[in-house]
């Protein structure tokens, strides 16, 4: 139903893992993984805004939001308030009231993520502090995104279950991806498994 609606609204092509009858008449870009493709296409569509930001990414079972706000406050002083924030509570894309709003996810969906990065860059932001949930990696919302600094706070079995991570190993693997994709890493010395 979404494809038919998009077609009615003027879509000129669609990206999917298979062709759909509702897309007849539209070019189909067939990919192996829609979520990964969406992240890469989002970055390209919005002109790779991440390349214009110094990005500090924070992951952990507990403490992401508090750490993000501490980092934001410290960097605000050294960047003359040219810092964006993507947290569980708020997204701040600039210094005007309309650039500050409540978040609906810890880490936004890929199109929202790159859109908001573009707005932040266009608003003169030079730095971004963002929380990165393990679900963001599991769902490939941030596929292809690299960070200047990655901070790994901790890990515990809080999010193990059928709705999030089936095993602790899966949760750990997702969180470790932040380290793999960071130029520099900070790891809490008290974190088990490290």
Locations of regions flagged by a protein language model:
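N-terminal leader/targeting and accessory segments in enzymes
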Residues: 1-40
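Residue-level signal for inorganic ion chemistry
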Residues: 6, 41, 58, 86, ...
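Non-catalytic positions within long, well-ordered alpha-helices that form the structural scaffold/packing
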Residues: 7-8, 121, 143
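Acidic, Mg2+-coordinating active-site environments of NTP-dependent enzymes
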Residues: 16, 20-25, 122-123, 138, ...
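Walker A (P-loop) phosphate-binding motif
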Residues: 43-93, 98
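Flexible beta-alpha connector loops of hexameric P-loop NTPases
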Residues: 98-109, 158-166
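Conserved nucleotide-sensing/catalytic segment adjacent to the nucleotide-binding pocket
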Residues: 101-130
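Glycine-rich phosphate-binding loop used to anchor ATP phosphates in small-molecule kinases
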Residues: 124-138, 142
């Amino acid at each position: 139903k979404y494809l038919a609606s998009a077609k009615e609204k003027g879509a000129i092509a669609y990206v999917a893992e298979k062709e759909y009858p509702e897309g007849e008449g539209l070019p189909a870009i067939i990919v192996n993984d829609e979520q990964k493709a969406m992240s890469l296409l989002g970055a390209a569509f919005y002109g790779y805004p991440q390349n214009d930001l110094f990005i500090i990414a924070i992951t952990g079972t507990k403490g992401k939001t508090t750490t993000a706000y501490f980092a934001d406050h410290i960097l605000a002083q050294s960047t003359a308030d040219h810092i964006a924030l993507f947290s569980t509570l708020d997204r701040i894309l600039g210094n005007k009231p309309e650039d500050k709003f409540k978040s609906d996810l810890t880490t936004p969906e890929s199109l929202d993520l790159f859109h908001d990065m573009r707005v932040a860059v266009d608003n003169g932001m030079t730095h971004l502090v963002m929380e990165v949930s393990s679900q963001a990696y599991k769902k490939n919302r941030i596929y292809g995104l690299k960070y200047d600094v990655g901070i790994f706070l901790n890990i515990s079995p809080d999010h193990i279950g059928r709705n999030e991570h089936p095993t602790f190993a899966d949760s750990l693997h997702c969180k470790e991806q932040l380290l793999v994709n960071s130029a520099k890493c900070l790891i809490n010395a008290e974190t088990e498994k490290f």
